[in-house]
Amino acid sequence: MEEGGDFDNYYGADNQSECEYTDWKSSGALIPAIYMLVFLLGTTGNGLVLWTVFRSSREKRRSADIFIASLAVADLTFVVTLPLWATYTYRDYDWPFGTFSCKLSSYLIFVNMYASVFCLTGLSFDRYLAIVRPVANARLRLRVSGAVATAVLWVLAALLAMPVMVFRTTGDLENTTKVQCYMDYSMVATVSSDWAWEVGLGVSSTTVGFVVPFTIMLTCYFFIAQTIAGHFRKERIEGLRKRRRLLSIIVVLVVTFALCWMPYHLVKTLYMLGSLLHWPCDFDLFLMNVFPYCTCISYVNSCLNPFLYAFFDPRFRQACTSMLCCGQSRCAGTSHSSSGEKSASYSSGHSQGPGPNMGKGGEQMHEKSIPYSQETLVVD
């Protein structure tokens, strides 16, 4: 994930076309405003997610909560840097904070990009194991804990983001008094080979940070949807409404991720390849101008997840209500009652066939036939 507006200088490469660059002036005010909005919503929402996860006892935490908490930490780590980038953009890409903050804030952006998508992938794989391969899931949990898995994901994200810490620097913009925060490959490349590093790092970050994880997520949710559909085909008509709800949650997760990230990665990759393919001037300038807005869309994902939790996860809604009520018994009682009713209604559509826990001929069904409850379908 790159800071959006200063496209060329972010990668440390000049536009090799002879096109005359014309900026979309509206971005100078609009983009900083979006950054600050994401900062406010992201710090509040992700802080609330962390509070919700860690306020519950260890026994009540779901297997996916470690990934949810890790995702919130990644988003929170990123959004706290947004005031710096908002200032940078508002000052027409003049960096006043020094070289170290340029390196660190840029590094945290990339750590967030990798850590977030890896956590989402880990969460998707966790749901796949819990729903599609419950036996393998139980065996795997005996060997690898969620904490160990997320630690590995964070180490991998930190290593993949390291080139930014190495190559990011500040420098005076030619013929101006502005100081820019950009990628400088001079320590490893000549001026003529800068583009190779630019293209190599840009395409590899898109491949590792989007294409591969997104493919894994799609695969996991495909098998999850297939398993859920097979389960509900065995139920009566009243189960169809729950079936549609569960499948819609899966679609929302995948589509939201794609809508937030695909424009950014697509535009970035097209621009990187422009050094090789030599796009027409109009198209090249369009990519340069639209990229900051694609970046803003990807940034929105860092504050969007808490709203998805609030919409789809009854337990998260109950925790939020409890906090807003400040522990008042009347409000807490109402929230508890409402949550209980929703939970009962939600799980009944998953576990019941002709009667409560009854199979054909009135035979008692075993608990293992209920792997599709709210507990295993926790959303992203």
UniProtKB/Swiss-Prot annotation:
Cysteine disulfide links: 19-281, 102-181
Gene: APLNR
Keyword list, A-Z: Cell membrane, Developmental protein, Disulfide bond, G-protein coupled receptor, Gastrulation, Glycoprotein, Membrane, Receptor, Transducer, Transmembrane, Transmembrane helix
Topology feature Cytoplasmic, residues: 55-64, 126-146, 224-246, 313-380
Gene3D superfamilies xrefs: Rhodopsin 7-helix transmembrane proteins
Residue ranges of the region described as Disordered: 342-380
Membrane-topology annotation of the record: Multi-pass membrane protein
Compositional bias per record (Low complexity), positions renumbered to this chain: 342-351
Keyword Magnesium set for record: no
Transmembrane segments: 31-54, 65-86, 100-125, 147-164, 199-223, 247-270, 290-312
Compositionally biased spans, kind Polar residues: 371-380
GO cellular component entries: plasma membrane
UniProt GO BP: apelin receptor signaling pathway; blood vessel development; coronary vasculature development; G protein-coupled receptor signaling pathway; gastrulation; heart development; negative regulation of cAMP-mediated signaling; positive regulation of angiogenesis
Protein name per UniProt: Apelin receptor
Entry's family note: Belongs to the G-protein coupled receptor 1 family.
Main location: membrane
Organism: Macaca mulatta
Residues in the Extracellular compartment per record: 1-30, 87-99, 165-198, 271-289
Domain notes: The hydrogen bond between Asn-46 and Asp-75 is crucial for beta-arrestin signaling induced by APLN/apelin-13.
Molecular functions (GO terms): apelin receptor activity; G protein-coupled peptide receptor activity; mechanoreceptor activity
Location within or outside the cell: Cell membrane
Feature type site, description Required for APELA and APLN/apelin-13 interaction and signaling: 85, 168
Function statement: G protein-coupled receptor for peptide hormones apelin (APLN) and apelin receptor early endogenous ligand (APELA/ELA), that plays a role in the regulation of normal cardiovascular function and fluid homeostasis. When acting as apelin receptor, activates both G(i) protein pathway that inhibits adenylate cyclase activity, and the beta-arrestin pathway that promotes internalization of the receptor. APLNR/APJ also functions as mechanoreceptor that is activated by pathological stimuli in a G-protein-independent fashion to induce beta-arrestin signaling, hence eliciting cardiac hypertrophy. (Microbial infection) Alternative coreceptor with CD4 for HIV-1 infection; may be involved in the development of AIDS dementia.
Pfam families in the cross-refs: 7tm_1
Glycosylation sites: 15, 175
InterPro entries xrefs: Apelin_rcpt (IPR003904), CCR1-9-like (IPR050119), GPCR_Rhodpsn (IPR000276), GPCR_Rhodpsn_7TM (IPR017452)
Record-linked CDD domains: 7tmA_Apelin_R
Assembly and binders: Homodimer; dimerization inhibits APLNR-mediated G protein and beta-arrestin signaling pathways compared to monomeric APLNR.
